[in-house]
Amino acid sequence: DLHNALWVLYKRMSEAQSFTNPMKYLLMRDWPLLKRYEAEMCRRFDAVTAVSEEDKAALIEAGAPSDMTVIPIAVDLDSQPYIERQPKGPHIIHIGTMYWPANINAINWFLDAIYPLIKARLPEVRCTLIGARPPESIIERAKADPSLTVTGYVDDPLPYLQDASMMIVPLKAGGGMRVKILNALAQGIPMVTTTV
């Protein structure tokens, strides 16, 4: 079982970094190594599954056997009941691990490029970022902007989902299946995401 082709994520993350960011060069060094490693791991097993056709193709490109099976991630609708939402005005939420570099990059891009455009049209908009271990840089942004809230980890996101007008997944780099998108759609939460 492979959750996703991780080398693709590292490659996309390297492409999303600016040339002045040292992380770009670490990722540029690491993704080809990871690509070879993932192919080698796939060759060691009699059967391998991937979560999407895209991941299967990426693993085959890396050198994995082509007889891989795709088993898409599914959402149990009984365990993800529809949520009756009653937002108190326009409210955007993001749920995701806030120490994962792809999520940090996504949130910074959203706050720099997209959120100001939304605020210009909807000055009363609120944005709540939910997820464990947010970096200090994002916490500082929230201190400077009263419309932005950073919660850190929450035991139960239900109150935030009930108050959400929409959920965002603004990834600029990623791989595999974004399960949170499936969960939110099953729960009736409007979703805006990038094409990654």
Predicted regions: what they are:
Residues 1-36, 97:
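Acceptor-binding helix/loop patch of EC 2.4 sugar-transfer enzymes
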Residues 61, 70-163:
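Conserved catalytic-core segment of nucleotide-activated headgroup transferases in glycan assembly
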Residues 51, 152, 169-175, 195-196:
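Short Ser/Thr-rich beta->loop micro-motif in glycosyltransferases that lines
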Residues 46, 147, 159-176, 187-191:
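Acidic donor-binding loop of glycosyltransferase active sites
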